[in-house]
Amino acid sequence: MSIKYVATSKLPTPWGVFAMHGFEDTETGKEHVALTFGTLSSDAPVLGRIHSECLTGDALFSLRCDCGFQLQTAMQNIAETGSGFILYLRQEGRGIGLLNKIRAYELQDKGANTVEANEQLGFPADMRKYDMIQPMLEQIGVKHVRLMTNNPRKVKAMKEIGIEVVERVPLQVGKNRYNEAYLKTKSTELGHMMSEYHFTDED
């Protein structure tokens, strides 16, 4: 994989001004983004998140998933901490793309869960890859991470490229009546680490 750093700009947000670093995968044409806040240390653990693109959750406020809630909470946590990063990877629909994701949603509307829908379309449950994160982390100077995730595959991906995951910080937000079954499937079939309280009815 050939990841090329392109440019950096300021990104004002409701939580403060982040820096937005653009990267291009010259083999696939995919464009990825690293958001950083404050001064990042190469010696001390840095709060961060690997976030896969979710147009419906991140930009269209969908309640079918928890992605948008996780992104906003991660950005807020980073701003409150004073420093941190988000690697925003263009892997829509756990890697199957936007239109296939809509096809999968159609199957879910008919009763399939998120894993079954992917498989009925001929895809694995999760097609995401994380090999692009190494050059991105090298560019922003991060070697030790407090990783905001419920996904053990992301912890493994960090460790495999030599990044020390000092702490896994749970990110359990956004549960609602539209996504509760989806969250249960992520826990039971995709191995996401979520505590039982996340599935109890809210008052």
UniProtKB/Swiss-Prot annotation:
Gene3D superfamilies: GTP cyclohydrolase II
List of residues binding Zn(2+): 54, 65, 67
One Pfam family per UniProt: GTP_cyclohydro2
Keywords: GTP-binding, Hydrolase, Metal-binding, Nucleotide-binding, Riboflavin biosynthesis, Zinc
Binding site for GTP: 49-53, 70, 92-94, 114, 149, 154
Catalytic activity, reaction form: GTP + 4 H2O = 2,5-diamino-6-hydroxy-4-(5-phosphoribosylamino)-pyrimidine + formate + 2 phosphate + 3 H(+)
EC code: 3.5.4.25
Domain of life where this protein originates: Bacteria
Cellular compartments per GO CC: cytosol
One Gene Ontology biological process: riboflavin biosynthetic process
Molecular-function GO term, any one: GTP cyclohydrolase II activity
Protein name as annotated: GTP cyclohydrolase-2
Organism: Shewanella sp. (strain MR-4)
Biological classification of the source: Bacteria, Pseudomonadati, Pseudomonadota, Gammaproteobacteria, Alteromonadales
